[in-house]
């Protein structure tokens, strides 16, 4: 309780103070002789408490951000009130003294009690446009006082000038009524005069104005429209707004007003709508609908106006679906002062403060705010292009430049970000050709005018797949030290990638759970339900058909499917489905061209998982499921797929999944020891079945310890010739790093360097147009697997030549006799299936440097022969 109270107290201060909990708990454990079960329980509780602390810190940071936004709104309101008072003082100073004396005489005649003036500021500013400039309606005051004589009445205006303004108000009302009787006012001015008449009646204690034909009972201040910046009228010499947005509250008067607006707009289509020349904002009635953007109301438009009229280089215009555009950058050539011209420009263009192309599509190509989800269903065939055409042809060069810039940015963005956009449905319809042809042609015309529709190569990048939820897969005992396959594997790799800056250069793919249908492409339905949902979901299934008869009791106290593969019903299903789903998503984006290649930092591994058998830490065969999905979704782009498995253990599950598939090549470099190393499969004679004979190529090393020279010999004599002959369209690598140095003999025992894995990755980029995806399999020495993964990702990014740079010892050493014997057997068996393997025996017992020099000499001779010919 003391720790919890101290944590809460620190959260309310300047920042969260995280107590040093690990040292305290460990000291307590060390001082008492507790049972192992109690220690495990304390450790699990400690982990949960740390997670709660991190959640508390996250909530605290979000609360600080919300508080900052609230401070911004308060500052905006204070500046607004100050500007309002300054305008009132300026207006009073210009009043004719003659009007003051007339007002005194009038008030002497009507000195009785009056109703409270709740909308004094708004009424005064609304009716003070004698010189043709439309004043801005202000927010109604919240102060309401009891009925009192006029001389003692309190309001926002000083007492000294209240009589002058009252007389001025009466004069304005008389003028408006006279204009209305002559028929010079339009329908909107009639509505405005009705509202003003009602307020005038309350101010004069129930006295009705003469020549008043109709009144509107204003019983709530919510009828008052939003305040509009004065600079809009000054910039464009506009007379009066035709319609204003209502305050977005759930009050009854506002609801009635919205219903009235819908009734007024009934029967008039957007094509027949004629815009008025004397309007500031040509808002249509759908503009009154609530916005579905969370950012559209965060920053008030007038907050920019309150600052000095200078360009703000740091000012950003948030957009829900397009990259943020800096105000200084977007309007650099226009030299717009933020205080006035930007607001005026956006008003004439009929823009909301936040322009978003998917929002425009969802709004039926009318430029304005975002609409509700219900409007998106009627996107097709229910709107016209007149609104877009009229706004584009308004002579506003600034608006066209901004729109073209946003269209350009949208085209250059990856389709992956568009899919994640909450407004991307309308944009997806544009891509699928579902929008009316007229709308599509207008957008293309704007794009062609800016000259950016020329062929441009998309800027693809490397994708990374990772999710913290996969770390939570652990044994029920809670002691990760007793299990080599634990969450620290992917945590250490991810930290290494962050340390070298690779995560910042790449695009992180959103982790998704694989569906049951996707998993059933490789595994049976019962097996999928058992390990993807829960074993309890299979209680009604016949026990003979279950994939597992019973769980084993592990020495650590947990349970498992075998002596190595632990199972936890609370976390295993989620992690296993995320591992397969993340690889599917990453591979799909590479196949579609949204990413150039990728690395999936996932667990648990999968290449040992068979159709109905979990083993070797594996539950679902991630690589096999991803390949099946690619074959199903992209039969043209992924007609031929190559799987390279360089895990030190043979991928028995992957080989069984494709031993009959003539469109999938499976090649494995692994330790075999003549069948005495786990899992014991993957001999040189396993070449595939039926039409797929020769498409399973195993390089089963036995005997001596293998290092870089042996892997280089296998790569140049077997892997590269077969890959060149197969010509794959897509490559997936079972990237296990347990052949790397640092692993004990039982887990690997080989001494391959991390640079060798980078070298193999760089070599694979020469095939399949560089569409290569690596999926983490095995590897349990955290230091070596982190370095190996870093080398692979660096090679995928392709910005540095340091990736895969081998040492001189590796390049100038001969392979050991055990490797030479294995490679000779592989070539002898597979050269009947792959003619490119003929003559490769001579390249086995040479160094990598000698082989490169020999290739260079052969290439030079061929060039000389071509020149002579």
UniProtKB/Swiss-Prot annotation:
Tissue expression summary: Expressed in body-wall muscle cells, hypodermal seam cells and neuronal cells including sensory amphid neuronal processes, the nerve ring, ventral nerve cords and motor neuronal commissures.
Catalytic activity reported: N(6)-acetyl-L-lysyl-[histone] + H2O = L-lysyl-[histone] + acetate
Major subcellular location class: nucleus
Single GO MF annotation: transcription corepressor activity
Role this protein plays: Responsible for the deacetylation of lysine residues on the N-terminal part of the core histones (H2A, H2B, H3 and H4). Histone deacetylation gives a tag for epigenetic repression and plays an important role in transcriptional regulation, cell cycle progression and developmental events. Histone deacetylases act via the formation of large multiprotein complexes. Involved in transduction of sensory signals, together with egl-4, kin-29 and mef-2; binding to transcription factor mef-2 enables negative modulation of chemoreceptor gene expression in chemosensory neurons.
Stored Pfam families: Hist_deacetyl (PF00850)
Active site per database record: 608
Name this protein carries in UniProt: Histone deacetylase 4
GO CC field: cytoplasm; histone deacetylase complex; nucleus
Phenotype when changing residue 515 to A: Localizes to cytoplasm; does not affect chemoreceptor str-1 expression
EC class (word): hydrolase
Keywords noted in UniProt: Chromatin regulator, Hydrolase, Nucleus, Phosphoprotein, Repressor, Transcription, Transcription regulation
Annotated region (Disordered), positions in chain: 1-25, 128-167, 180-218
PTM summary: Phosphorylated by serine/threonine-protein kinase kin-29 at Ser-251; the phosphorylation inhibits repression of transcription by mef-2. May be phosphorylated by either cyclic-AMP dependent or cyclic-GMP dependent protein kinases.
Location of the protein in the cell: Nucleus
Organism: Caenorhabditis elegans
Modified residues (Phosphoserine): 251
SUPFAM superfamilies the UniProt entry points to: Arginase/deacetylase (SSF52768)
InterPro entries: HDAC_PDAC, His_deacetylse, His_deacetylse_dom, His_deacetylse_dom_sf, Ureohydrolase_dom_sf
Sequence similarity: Belongs to the histone deacetylase family. HD type 2 subfamily.
């Amino acid at each position: 309780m003391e720790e919890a109270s101290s944590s809460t107290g620190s959260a309310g201060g300047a920042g969260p103070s995280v107590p040093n909990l690990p040292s305290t708990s460990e000291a307590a454990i060390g001082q008492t002789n507790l049972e192992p079960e109690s220690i495990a329980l304390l450790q699990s509780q400690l982990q949960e408490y740390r997670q709660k602390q991190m959640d508390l810190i996250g909530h605290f940071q979000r609360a600080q951000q919300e508080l900052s936004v609230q401070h911004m709104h308060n500052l905006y309101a204070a500046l607004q009130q100050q500007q309002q008072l300054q305008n009132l003082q300026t207006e009073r100073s210009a009043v004719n003294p003659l009007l003051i004396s007339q007002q005194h005489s009038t008030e002497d005649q009507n000195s009785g009690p009056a109703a409270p003036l709740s909308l004094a500021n708004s009424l005064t500013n609304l009716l003070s446009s004698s010189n043709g400039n439309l004043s801005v309606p202000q927010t109604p005051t919240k102060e309401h006082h009891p009925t009192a004589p006029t001389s003692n009445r309190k309001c926002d205006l000083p007492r000294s000038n209240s009589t002058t303004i009252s007389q001025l108000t009466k004069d304005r009302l008389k003028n408006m009524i006279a204009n209305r009787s002559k028929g010079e006012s339009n329908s909107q001015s009639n509505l405005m005069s009705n509202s003003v008449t009602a307020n005038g009646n309350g101010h004069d204690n129930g006295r009705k104005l003469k020549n008043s034909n109709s009144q509107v009972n204003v019983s709530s201040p919510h009828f008052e429209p939003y305040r509009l910046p004065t600079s809009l009228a000054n910039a464009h010499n506009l007379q009066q707004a035709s319609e204003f947005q209502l305050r977005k509250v759930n009050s009854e008067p506002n609801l009635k007003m919205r219903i009235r607006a819908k009734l007024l707009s009934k029967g008039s289509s957007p094509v027949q709508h004629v815009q008025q020349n004397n309007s500031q904002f040509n808002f249509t009635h759908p503009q009154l609908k609530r916005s579905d953007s969370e950012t559209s109301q965060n920053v008030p438009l007038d907050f920019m106006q309150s600052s000095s009229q200078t360009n703000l280089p740091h000012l950003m215009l948030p957009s829900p679906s397009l990259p943020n555009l800096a105000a200084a950058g977007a309007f650099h050539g226009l030299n717009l002062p933020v205080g006035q011209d930007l607001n005026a420009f956006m008003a004439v263009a009929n823009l909301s403060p936040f322009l978003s192309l998917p929002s425009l599509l969802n709004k039926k190509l009318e430029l304005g705010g975002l609409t509700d989800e219900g409007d998106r269903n009627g996107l097709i065939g229910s709107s016209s292009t007149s609104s877009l055409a009229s706004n584009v042809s308004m002579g506003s060069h600034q608006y066209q430049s901004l729109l073209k810039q946003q269209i350009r940015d949208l085209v250059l963005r990856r389709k992956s970000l568009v899919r994640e956009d909450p407004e991307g449905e309308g944009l997806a319809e544009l891509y699928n050709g579902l929008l009316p042809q007229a709308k599509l042609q207008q957008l293309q015309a704007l794009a062609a005018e800016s000259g950016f529709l020329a062929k441009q190569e998309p800027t693809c990048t490397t994708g990374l797949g990772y999710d913290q939820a996969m770390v939570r897969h652990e044994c029920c005992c809670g002691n990760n030290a007793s299990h080599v396959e634990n969450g620290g594997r992917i945590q250490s790799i991810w930290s290494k990638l962050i340390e070298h800056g690779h995560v910042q250069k790449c695009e992180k793919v959103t982790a998704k759970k694989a569906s049951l249908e996707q998993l059933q492409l490789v595994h049976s339905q019962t097996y999928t339900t058992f390990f993807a949902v829960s074993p309890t979901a299979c209680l009604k299934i016949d026990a003979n058909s279950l994939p597992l008869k019973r769980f084993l009791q592990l020495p650590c106290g947990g349970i498992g499917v075998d002596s190595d593969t632990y199972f936890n019903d609370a976390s295993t299903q989620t992690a296993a489905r995320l591992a397969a789903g993340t690889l599917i998503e990453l591979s799909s984006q590479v196949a579609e061209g949204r990413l150039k290649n990728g690395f999936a930092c996932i667990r648990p591994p999968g290449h040992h998982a068979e159709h109905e058998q979990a083993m070797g830490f594996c539950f679902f065969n991630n690589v096999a499921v991803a390949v099946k999905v690619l074959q199903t979704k992209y039969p043209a782009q992924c007609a031929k797929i190559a799987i390279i498995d360089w895990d030190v253990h043979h991928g028995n599950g992957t080989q069984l999944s494709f031993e009959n598939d003539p469109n999938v090549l499976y090649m494995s470099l692994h330790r075999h020891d003549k069948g005495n190393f786990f899992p014991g499969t993957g001999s040189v004679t396993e070449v595939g079945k039926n039409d797929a004979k020769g498409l399973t190529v195993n390089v089963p090393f036995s005997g001596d310890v293998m290092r870089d020279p042996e892997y280089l010999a296998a790569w140049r004599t077997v892997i590269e010739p077969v890959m060149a002959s197969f010509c794959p369209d897509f490559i997936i690598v079972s990237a296990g790093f347990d052949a790397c140095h640092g692993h004990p003999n039982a887990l690997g025992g080989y001494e391959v360097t991390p640079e060798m894995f980078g070298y193999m990755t760089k070599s694979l980029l020469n095939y399949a147009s560089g569409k290569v995806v690596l999926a983490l399999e095995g590897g349990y020495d955290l230091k070596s697997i982190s370095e190996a993964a870093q080398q692979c990702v660096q090679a995928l990014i392709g910005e540095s030549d340091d990736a895969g740079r081998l040492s001189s010892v590796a390049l100038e050493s001969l392979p050991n006799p055990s490797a030479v014997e294995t490679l000779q057997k592989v070539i002898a068996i597979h050269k009947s299936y792959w003619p490119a393997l003929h003559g490769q025996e001579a390249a086995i017992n040479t160094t990598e440097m000698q082989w490169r020099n020999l290739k260079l000499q052969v290439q030079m001779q061929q060039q000389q022969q071509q020149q002579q010919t």
